Amino acid sequence: MSSVVHVTLPDGSVREYPQGITIAEAVAQIGPRLAKAALAAKVDGRLVDLSARLEKDCTLQVLTFKDEEGREVFRHTSTHIMAQAVKRLFPEAKLTVGPPLENSFYYDFDLPRPLTPEDLEKIEAEMAKIVEADYPIVRQEVDREEAKRFFAERGEDYKVLLVDKIPEDEVVSIYTQGEFTDLCVGPHLPSTGRVKAFKLLSVAGAYWEGNQANKQLQRVYGTSFESKKDLEDYLFRLEEARRRDHRRLGPELGLYRFEEVAPGFAFWLDKGYRLYRELENWSRKLQEARGYEEVSTPWIVSSKLYETSGHWQHYRQNMFEIRAEDQDFATKPMNCPCHCVLYKSQIRSYRDLPLKIAEYGPLSRFEASGTLHGLLRVRGFHQDDAHLFVRPDQIEEQIREVIGLVDTIYGTLGLEYEIKLSTRPEDFMGDIELWNEAEAALARALDGMGRSYKLNPGDGAFYGPKLDFDVTDALGRKWQCATVQLDFQLPIKFDLTYIGEDGKEHRPVMIHRAIMGTLERFIGILTEHYAGNFPLWMAPVQARVLPITDRHHAYAGEVVAKLQEAGLRVEGDYRNEKVGYKIREAELLKIPFILVVGDKEAEAGAVAVRRRGMKDLGPMPLADFLALAQSEIASKAMDEACRKAASGTRD
């Protein structure tokens, strides 16, 4: 009688199979729909091909395109299909590496000449032939020296180097599809025919192993999906991302710009700085209502402060240093050490806690020039930064309040988010009981508010557990924005204490928190999320008044003055241009309201209202328009153009 294996599925059910059955065969017995969708699997948590055999009792998870790891396998096979096509068209090409990415993939090639757009079209056509052929993809484990001989005989020098880098205790494996063989740990799809929809996107330069001293390679990017519709949707989002790019919209809308004289530092223009101040002042009011004390601490600080905090030893490479009068200083990369100094400046009682210190001052960190990316990755920035000094028994309550503040800000802006709870790492510092209670307090706060969250075991900082809030924008991209970080170590390093009810000194817990995070980055995200169609309340220019002819300038000036006096950000366009031209320009600048004034409007004390993204609202008494605008500003509502942009839908 043949042996059997017991396989536990994710739902807890246990199935019995003959020993040695392939995963593909086992999945077929579970159901035809799952068998058709299956891409790869995890056996006892290890990624494997569907051709792998079940030799002992185990857990089994079938991966489909709905799973992140399933998509990675799908796109990893896509890189091999692309590499096979390149080798067919360019036999002299040398293969290096080709990993999957979140929504795409790439492969680096050593080629004698640059690839052209026409070359990409030919590669795509050849890939289609490989998919049509539906070659089985076969895994083979080989001897290390045999693998080196195999690739050396074919002139694949980079692959020989890669074999040498495989640890001695790891298996060397190759994958073959048709005439093509590549060194790869896998897993892969069962056959090339599974990749039905793909597109090559671009070619860029890349260096072998990322070292500029090495030869430059050609990196071909592509993407792939299970269906043509999913591919089309992704390509639409990709084009939308280009159209919404804040690095283009910022200068076009007169918000900000970057100059070579200050790489990584934004030059804020008048309109952009208005938007910046609106967000900052809104945040300030929300924090004042919750008992925060706003401070301003020095921008340049002695290295001695950072020696105490530990940043000089562990973060110095990311700081801008200054040497003056035989002393070392640095521009401030974060506010927490200075806030510790303020806390320690006087004796604190348990009644003084929680003490909430907020600051919006300038910060700077050194980032390599190659990593800078508009407002999203800068060297100079500001944060809606705050530090809460609390008793251990106050942690849960204060975390709830911070999450409530996140809700208020993100909810108003129409941003959805996911929460990650990162717990104690192996190299944690401090008392394990305090860690356990802090992690439990974070979890209780989330559970008590009915929040779902993802647990990241061991991913916390060494000095405390944390919550990360990942925002999803209109194009489905995720951005880590808000952070709530517990810190047990800085209070120790700065010897921070408070006098408890028992009259003895106790150590406070420090909570680092930022809601928007870096304001520069947050504005970059919002610019792309709204495609420049900012809600009325934060729009740099809320209305533009357009006189039809010169004789209407006086009335237009009266309208501008009255609206500005009422607190609206309004400007007039008095240029000697046709009104249609001025309307079109105001629309391109995404101004929420366009107010046209002529004889009828001047006589009636009215304005002809055009709303962004909508048809004309028609003539309206000026007082009625003002009431409409003020109501929308007070409620922080979004107009149709703003809502549509934030939804990411096609026109």
UniProtKB/Swiss-Prot annotation:
Cofactor(s) annotated in UniProt? Zn(2+)
Q: Which reaction does it catalyse?
A: tRNA(Thr) + L-threonine + ATP = L-threonyl-tRNA(Thr) + AMP + diphosphate + H(+)
Q: Which positions are annotated as binding Zn(2+)?
A: 336, 387, 512
Q: Where in the cell is it found?
A: Cytoplasm
Tell me the ranges covered by the TGS domain, including all copies.
1-64
One GO MF annotation is: catalytic activity, acting on a protein
Region annotated Catalytic sits at 245-535
- Similarity comment: Belongs to the class-II aminoacyl-tRNA synthetase family.
Function noted in UniProt: Catalyzes the attachment of threonine to tRNA(Thr) in a two-step reaction: L-threonine is first activated by ATP to form Thr-AMP and then transferred to the acceptor end of tRNA(Thr). Also edits incorrectly charged L-seryl-tRNA(Thr).
Q: What is this protein called?
A: Threonine--tRNA ligase
The source organism is Symbiobacterium thermophilum (strain DSM 24528 / JCM 14929 / IAM 14863 / T)
